[in-house]
Amino acid sequence: MPAPILPLIEAAAQWPARGALIGLDLGTKTIGVAVSDPDRRLATGVETIIHTAFKANAARLLLLAGQRNAVGFVLGLPINMDGSEGPRAQSTRAFARNFARLTDLPIGLWDERLSTSAVERELIANDVSRAKRAKVIDEHAAIFILQGALDRLTVLNAAPRTD
């Protein structure tokens, strides 16, 4: 049975209370990968995977998840500024559907609007060369996406319950 693909909050309900999450930023040529600590407080970069065949990319992601005892994935979903989903979002959803067939770890979708732009501005501000930026942008975007998701989950978990 394929893994569930859900909005972040619904996916979080499927994940155990503790355990690392793998954050993914699907670029056009690469996949940025980040990982959280088991308590889900901090995202750190893992690597940038250069797109090859889907099965090879998926095998690498599953290996990384296994090495880190991950309990789920957070996949950046590139929503347009008006809230609609364009071709990149459709491509991301197709990747998620195909990847879900290979794992039972729930996949949470997280709005990644402007993540790459924010990361690029930060790298430029830190005087990172254009060549170096091209090599690390998707990994840094994966960190940005995963950290945003972790922060959102922390806020929701800290909110007083009304039930």
UniProtKB/Swiss-Prot annotation:
Do the record's keywords include rRNA-binding? Answer: no
Q: What is its EC number?
A: 3.1.-.-
State the Gene Ontology BP annotations: rRNA 5'-end processing
Q: Record keywords: Cell inner membrane included?
A: no
Which keywords accompany this UniProt record?
Cytoplasm, Hydrolase, Nuclease, Ribosome biogenesis
Single Gene Ontology MF annotation: nuclease activity
Q: Where does the UniProt annotation locate this protein?
A: Cytoplasm
What GO CC annotations are associated with the protein? Answer: cytosol
Q: Entry's InterPro entries?
A: RNaseH-like_sf, YqgF, YqgF/RNaseH-like_dom, YqgF/RNaseH-like_dom_sf
Q: Name one Pfam family in it.
A: RuvX
Out of the domains of life, which is the source? Bacteria
Mainly resides where?
cytoplasm
Group of enzyme by EC: hydrolase
Q: What does this protein do?
A: Could be a nuclease involved in processing of the 5'-end of pre-16S rRNA.
Q: Which family does it belong to?
A: Belongs to the YqgF nuclease family.
Q: Which PANTHER family does the UniProt entry name for this protein?
A: POLYNUCLEOTIDYL TRANSFERASE, RIBONUCLEASE H-LIKE SUPERFAMILY PROTEIN
Any idea what this protein is called? Putative pre-16S rRNA nuclease
Species of the source: Rhodopseudomonas palustris (strain BisB18)
